[in-house]
Amino acid sequence: MQYLVVSFSHKNTDIVTREKLALSDDNKREDVATTLLQNPVINEAIILSTCNRIEIILSVKDPFSATEAVLKKLSEVSGINYEELEGRADIYEDNGAIHHVFSVASGLDSLVVGETQITGQIKDAYKEAYEKGWCGQKLGRVMHYAFKCSKEVRSSTDITRSPVSVASAAVSMAKEKLGNLGGMSALVVGAGEMGRLAAKHLISHGCNVILVGRDLEKTKTVAQEIDPDIRVEHVSNLQKLINSYRLLFSATSSKNPVITKDMVKEQSFDRYWFDMAVPRDIEEIYVARIHYFAVDDLKEIVNKNMAFREEQARNAYKIVGHHVNEFFKWLQTLEIDPIIKEIRKRAKDSALAELQKAIKKGYIPKEYEKSIEKLLHNAFNRFLHDPTKQLKAIADEPRADTIVEAIKFFFEIEEEVGLNRYKCEYYMNLRS
């Protein structure tokens, strides 16, 4: 039994590619799952498709052939050529696959690290796969451990608490100045990476986001990826918008200011403007009740929280690594059980066969059969107790493979048992 994940996410694909790959339609997912499960090397499948990632999670017999099958099918449904998908895809096998799934479920691989929405999305994907018969015990085990891992990461760390990007720092400062942001409306000018991050952070705090961009179609696509409830406006409406709302976050790639003095009117309410762009998007404006913050004003928050976030991420990845090892340890115990069961069965069958021979030949009276059966049962249980205990004890050790293979050879047991152990060591790739 082997695990495989073929992953496309915000880390290795752009918006356009992810949009083409998206399997948000039920029929599309059904088509992909059905095709993959018809392949003899693929046993089970779970399909996760969100705005920021497409994860094909599989239990397979042959990872290489299964990967080819996945890329071929995704090429067919997306219209993207096979070679491009092959070049972009992140492929994870066995221990790496489990570590990746646990990290994703814990929010450590998200665009906004630590976000909680992904756990619910994975639960929905698992529920669909289970109900439609795409997955069974093998991937079910993975999912249950993934949710257990996610719960511990959230309860044992503060990974979501301290912002380390300019966008998250801007939202954090807005929260500091205004308190609860829930129900407020916020303008986000610019649909690039920084604008997307700001929008995601604002939504996570319960804000109503208005996303403003030059390319209306692109802006609509970005908004749809983040949250379907985001309102989209063209930049031509910017003057009216900036004079109507209290919160503004700007992060365009313009070389010149997009908000100038002549666009601004005095209002009776306080406005908080966060300029996240370099060069600055907002011209120097001295208007009453406008509180202006530039990148340099936000760096203090970012720097203050960076060490804290790194510590929390280290703790989170330790938890993930622990759960990966626990998963394989538990899995290996399950896989050793069939061998132990087979040895006990053979011992019992041999003892009972000899008893029947003895009764048939008259060496043992028939009326003693049940008593002798019980005696033999106790004898071979006592004899096998220590070897069974030792076999379970070494399941987590490197020598387990050799010992189990020797037992299988001597007893001529054909049961497939995969005991390869992996040391779970991953370097952190911290993103804000």
Swiss-Prot record:
Marked site (Important for activity) residue numbers: 100
EC number(s) given by UniProt: 1.2.1.70
Positions annotated to bind NADP(+): 190-195
Pathway: Porphyrin-containing compound metabolism; protoporphyrin-IX biosynthesis; 5-aminolevulinate from L-glutamyl-tRNA(Glu): step 1/2
UniProt keyword Disulfide bond present: no
GO annotation (BP), single: protoporphyrinogen IX biosynthetic process from glutamate
PROSITE patterns per the UniProt record, alphabetical: GLUTR
First-level EC class: oxidoreductase
Record family assignment: Belongs to the glutamyl-tRNA reductase family.
Protein name stated in the entry: Glutamyl-tRNA reductase
